[in-house]
Amino acid sequence: GYAPSIASPANGKFVADFEAANKAAPDLYGADSYGVLFFYKAAVEKAGSTDTDKVRTAMRGLQWNTPQGTKTMRAGDHQAMQDMYAMRVNGGKFEVVGQVKADAAIGADVCSRF
């Protein structure tokens, strides 16, 4: 989930920039789209190339910062992991009322195919 009130290093800047550009608060889709751009950027930097195979390899196990906090792309099953948030809606605004750490929010990586 996502809420503009999530306390992460990247979120404050993201919210301010998004609101200035769009005259509206960001939602999950805006936050995820923003975060995935930095995933690709981090993978290209790690690969030292934009070559598809090199970037794909660099994505395995990669960590990057997003408005929702740090995300990790698991190497085995390519599952993106992040902390998950429980929300309450008050007056049309999302309020974070709980948080589950990424490693507790998803099952173990048992994939050995990749």
List the predicted regions and their residue ranges:
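Extracytosolic ligand-binding ectodomains
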Residues: 1-114
